[in-house]
Amino acid sequence: ESTDGWNNAGTGHAGYCELNYTPETAEGVEIDRALSINANFEISLQLWSSLVKTGELPAPNQFINPTPHISFVWGEKNVAFLRERYSKLSQHHLFKEMEYSEDFAVLNQWMPLVMTGRDTSVPVAATRISHGSDVDFGSLTRNLIASLESNEQFNLMVSHEVTDIERAKDKRWDVRLKNLETGKSIVISAANVFLGAGGGALPLLQKSGIPESKGYGGFPVSGQWLVCQNDEAVKRHHAKVYGKAALGAPPMSVPHLDTRIINGKPALLFGPFAGFTTKFLKKGSRLDLIKSIRPNNLVQMMDVG
């Protein structure tokens, strides 16, 4: 579900504009996580480039498009934070092309829709990396699967739900699948099982029973997003603009105004508007949260609350 184009912001988590990757500590702004995340994104770019060359992925503009990444803040304290963040990140070769400005006129050129009607007496600042990207992970995933389907050893099973994962005596994994159309179940033996980081991962991790699953909990804070496909508005904004979340607020609360190119059509994604749901997936059960509570994750759940 998370790979669908509209179910993520499409930054690729490059670390250019996501301010929660550079937390402010007693020693100042910490940049190590942003550097690590960006290095991983560069590896993803290299992989995709290689797959394009071998014909396993289509032309890059079918799933990734150049889009500037901008971090924007207001207020003296936040401006000081962004100034320090820029000072530290721009010294690293991965971020050497980052631009910084506190000039209202410059920011108006970078993101006119964001600056329109804003109080010019309030201190503002922004950083921009022009070589950022908008990634349509839905298109990327569909094309990767289409390529994998040419391999006889690959089998994609849709309309199936994993209902249990057990360690077998031979140290392999017995994975029980339920066909949601017929109701029938089968068991597949696998040497390795990989769980993605989507909404359905926690219940599967808990079913595996591995020691590392203990202590994890899910608190499904939701964000409602709106989409603008008005051509005139879309033409006036070409960037991914990220704000700064309030102290203690989850990353989901970071305000966005994102250029999106989904299935080749430009649009604007903006939000979030706070919400709450006990579902872990869009089409999940309202009991997902309750069913995930264990004695070993009660402390973590209470800390979130």
Question: How should these model regions be labeled?
Answer:
Residues E1-G5:
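Glycine-rich FAD pyrophosphate-binding loop
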Residues P58-T67, S71-A146, S150-N151, N155-M157, ...:
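Flavin (FAD/FMN) cofactor-binding and adjacent substrate-gating region
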Residues C17, K77-V79, T163, G200-A201, ...:
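Short, solvent-exposed loop/turn segments at secondary-structure junctions
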Residues G15-C17, K178-L180, F273:
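Generic beta-structure capping elements
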Residues H13, S71-V73, R128, R176, ...:
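Short, well-ordered beta-strand micro-motif
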